[in-house]
UniProtKB/Swiss-Prot annotation:
This enzyme's EC code(s): 4.2.1.59, 5.3.3.14
Function statement: Necessary for the introduction of cis unsaturation into fatty acids. Catalyzes the dehydration of (3R)-3-hydroxydecanoyl-ACP to E-(2)-decenoyl-ACP and then its isomerization to Z-(3)-decenoyl-ACP. Can catalyze the dehydratase reaction for beta-hydroxyacyl-ACPs with saturated chain lengths up to 16:0, being most active on intermediate chain length.
Gene3D superfamilies listed in its UniProt record: Hotdog Thioesterase (3.10.129.10)
Organism per entry: Xanthomonas oryzae pv. oryzae (strain KACC10331 / KXO85)
GO molecular function terms attached to this record: (3R)-hydroxyacyl-[acyl-carrier-protein] dehydratase activity; trans-2-decenoyl-acyl-carrier-protein isomerase activity
Location in or out of the cell: Cytoplasm
Reactions it catalyzes: a (3R)-hydroxyacyl-[ACP] = a (2E)-enoyl-[ACP] + H2O; (3R)-hydroxydecanoyl-[ACP] = (2E)-decenoyl-[ACP] + H2O; (2E)-decenoyl-[ACP] = (3Z)-decenoyl-[ACP]
Keywords (A to Z) from UniProt: Cytoplasm, Fatty acid biosynthesis, Fatty acid metabolism, Isomerase, Lipid biosynthesis, Lipid metabolism, Lyase
Protein name: 3-hydroxydecanoyl-[acyl-carrier-protein] dehydratase
InterPro entries associated with the record: FabA, FabA_FabZ, HotDog_dom_sf
Length: 171
């Protein structure tokens, strides 16, 4: 498939099934773990470091699966799901630029949570800036990311790392 600059939810779910890119390419998780509804922008230029950018959105609805269990009587989106979305988008970037293998989160340098996503929110926006891509024996992307809810920044993560592996047997 030709690289696009934006992707719909149906295309992202096709990625989860291995139908969007080459069969040996990385995949996004399927529902309900896919944590964004669309990628509105993806490029291997631009961003804060000039090495690439990814922008994505998640429509918030009170019936999203995590609100029913986290927490009963005090529904809030788990912070780890927002962080996972940032790793998902970083891995998608690697697949989008042609990296082969299975994506795995490798860590991050720093994470700050300064707000929360409640069922009354409308829109979560993810902004990912690629700071480094290694494409040798080790295939890895490093990014900085922000998560905004209804236009207000609530999560910041620095030095997110995702690698691509041809075998995860001994991972």
């Amino acid at each position: 498939m030709t690289r696009q600059s934006a992707y719909s939810r149906d295309q992202l779910l096709a990625s989860a099934r291995g139908e969007l890119f080459a069969p040996d390419s990385g995949r996004l998780p399927n529902d309900p773990m896919l944590m964004f509804d669309r990628i509105t922008e993806i490029s291997d230029t631009g961003g804060a470091h000039g090495k690439g950018v990814i922008r994505a959105e998640l429509d918030i609805r009170p019936d999203l699966w995590f609100f029913g269990c986290h927490f009963i009587g005090d529904p809030v989106m788990p912070g780890c799901l927002g962080l996972d979305a940032m790793w998902q988008l970083t891995g998608f970037f690697l697949t989008w630029i042609g990296a082969q293998g299975r994506g795995r989160a490798l860590g991050c340098g720093e994470v700050k949570f300064t707000g929360q996503v409640l069922p009354s929110a409308q829109l979560v926006r993810y902004e990912i800036d690629v700071s480094r891509v290694i494409n040798r024996k080790l295939v890895m992307a490093q990014t900085d990311a922000r998560m905004l809810v209804d236009g207000r920044e609530i999560y910041v993560a620095k030095d997110l790392r995702v690698g691509m592996f041809t075998s995860t047997e001994n991972f």
